UniProtKB/Swiss-Prot annotation:
Name by which UniProt lists this protein: Pyrimidine monooxygenase RutA
Annotated GO biological process: alkanesulfonate catabolic process; nitrogen utilization; uracil catabolic process
Binding-site positions, FMN: 49-50, 115, 124, 140-141, 190
Purpose of the protein: The FMN-N(5)-oxide reacts spontaneously with NADH to produce FMN. Requires the flavin reductase RutF to regenerate FMN in vivo.
Catalytic activity: uracil + FMNH2 + NADH + O2 = (Z)-3-ureidoacrylate + FMN + NAD(+) + H2O + H(+); thymine + FMNH2 + NADH + O2 = (Z)-2-methylureidoacrylate + FMN + NAD(+) + H2O + H(+)
GO molecular function: alkanesulfonate monooxygenase activity; uracil oxygenase activity
Amino acid sequence: MDLGVFIPIGNNGWLISTASPQYKPTFELNKQIVQRAEHYGFEFALSMIKLRGFGGKSEFWDYNLESFTLMAGLAAVTSRIKLFASTAVLTLPPAIVARMATTIDSISGGRFGINIVSGWAKAEYEQMGLWPGDDYFGYRYAYSTEYVQVMQELWRTGASDFKGKYFQMTDCHMKPLPAHKIEIVAAGQSPTGMAFAATYADYNFVLASGVNTPTAHVKLNEQLLDAVAKTGRDVGAYVLFMVIADETDEAAMAKWQAYKDGTDVDALVWMADQGSKDQSAAGSSTAKTINLPEQALNFNMGTIVGSYATVARLLDEAASVPGTKGLMLTFDDFVQGIESFGQHVQPLMTSRAARLLPAA
């Protein structure tokens, strides 16, 4: 089973709270996190792309780095870990992203892939004059499909005359070709998103849910497996969890309660407003799921809270769900969280026994 880290490219990570660790994103912070993840044998790191924050007292995600340039820098200071950058498809032409990816493939020696972000937060794009209108909600995966087709043709042949509804190439050239396969990942939660991932992605990120309910993603995995059965491709689920660990269950739960008590309500209001813009969104879509009231302070992602032994046991249960190829983790405190996980949690995980690397 693969293990990845969802790095904090935006301030305060994934906790919309004034009581959680407060920090700004920097290259040095993310370098430290990714290098330590590599040290502990993590297989991959992913950076999101977010172009407008949620505001509130915590100024949540008002500070964000850019994904490709960050990962290019990290590629130069790592040696084994796979790196995924995110492209917001409304912001960068596919031919440019194909060339950027080829460059980072060269820097990393074949450790680079791309996460396709079709976009659900209208304000991110509207502020730059890039929002094509609300009908985009209905065709964003068709748009993303053509986007990926253009990139893959350029990577495969170095040229494209692609003629689609949204993109038209005219004797478009891109050389050198990438020396290695550039993997594609997606994060489809809706049936349309799952179908896109099953057709074009190598992995699909799946949102786990609940607190200490490690197998709650079983239905989403089943939906992905059904979608993959129709395409005949091998696409596994990378399941997203937040880890809040401490020496005892009680200490970890006390931290989680404190974060909940400090929920930044104003930031949640902004997120809910953005999530409501797509009137046709499926109930399982990302925009709907992250705004469910039960646990919106961390986007309703699956949350594992407990002692090191409890966290290890629950993550092993998560890994056992059919279709799960890996887990992607966030932490309440990334610097301390990576160290605690590497030293105290991972050695207890049976699902990681075959992957453990000796400390350098």
